[in-house]
Amino acid sequence: MNKVYITGSGLWVPPDLITNDELVASYNEYARRSNERNAAAIASGEVAVVPESSSEFIEKASGIKQRYVVDKTGVLDPDRMCPVIPPRPNEQISLMAEMAVGAAREALNNAGRKAEEVDLVIVACSSFQRPYPAIAVEVQFALGCGGYGYDMNVACSSATFGIEQAANAVRSGSARCALVISPELPSGHLEWRDRDCHFIFGDIATAVVVEASPSGQQKSAWEILGSKAATVFSNNIRNNSGFLDRCDPVSRDNRDKLFMQEGRKVFKEVCPMAADHISSHLAANGFAASDVNRFWLHQANLTMNHLIAKRILGREATPQEAPVILDKFANTASAGSIIAFHQHNTDLAFGSIGVICSFGAGYSIGSHILKRV
């Protein structure tokens, strides 16, 4: 079987940062206004009180301290509570493509590759700003890549699933050098007025170069020793927004048209699924958990990651074994594990073993066993 490598990674970070304190101040002002406006209905029991939030609650519940977004003015406006993202003319690059290009250029630079050497572009992320034309084809055009491109969505597992498809294409010979890019824009589909989830997400874009052989100019290279993907249907993480919304104006703006989850159920079900997935993947490739130098896990919840790592290792993981970027970037959907990899892979010695794993809606879980070469 032909060898395949991840030879570069890149990150695009939005311009605006929102701290928990900023977010809470805006949300609590919204809650105050809503409760004041609905005082009579609340008193009669017709409407529920909108509860206040706090920075302490957010950090305890998630481990998140801040997040980056493409626009904070709209998010922090109590009368709006969503980002201001004006439409662009078709002749101008789309926002998601622009994000993707930024991450891709850094990944190519770190891999020692030029855009024209790329013959496959996969844009893999949890949501898209339009059905067609594919964002990947727009990115391919903007960068000047050859070959072909396509979009794919497996929610928070999109990046790891995309890497597997890129690796398969390289192994089969249908591509020599692939870009897997995850421009995540969850600020656009998050209900910022919901206390249970208003703090969860941040915007970001990541990219990795997957190819048949390193250029020799790369900053680090990791051989993909094995990949594993799994899906099990669940409604516990769901977003019902889609092109059919216009067909039923009555339900067009319902709460379920944005991100929704049954958080406790997700926690209870996904933690053992992810841990067992990684453990069985390692065993199938002849590795014990103790052979792994680093786990780059999906960054959704700090307690969740601690429990998954403990179930795999049989003990608490050290910060070096399972690095956390969640506190700085929040949940960035499919990009989280790739941010962790991007920021925490070059310090490991040659021959080190690492695991990238992401999991999320579907349910879906994707993992890759890597060796530094």
PLM region descriptions:
Residues 1-93, 194-268, 272, 276, ...:
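Condensing-enzyme catalytic core mediating Claisen C-C bond formation in acyl metabolism
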Residues 6, 54-154, 284-305:
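Conserved beta-ketoacyl condensing-enzyme motif
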Residues 6-8, 58, 107, 121, ...:
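Buried hydrophobic positions in well-ordered alpha/beta secondary-structure cores of metabolic enzymes
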Residues 7, 124, 153, 178-184, ...:
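Short beta-strand segments
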Residues 17-18, 132-135, 163-164, 189-195, ...:
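Short acidic, glycine/serine/threonine-rich loops at helix termini
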Residues 101, 108, 127-129, 141-148, ...:
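Claisen-condensing/thiolase-fold acyl-transfer catalytic domains that form or cleave C-C bonds
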Residues 182-183, 190, 232-240, 301-304:
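Acyl-CoA/ACP chain-elongation machinery
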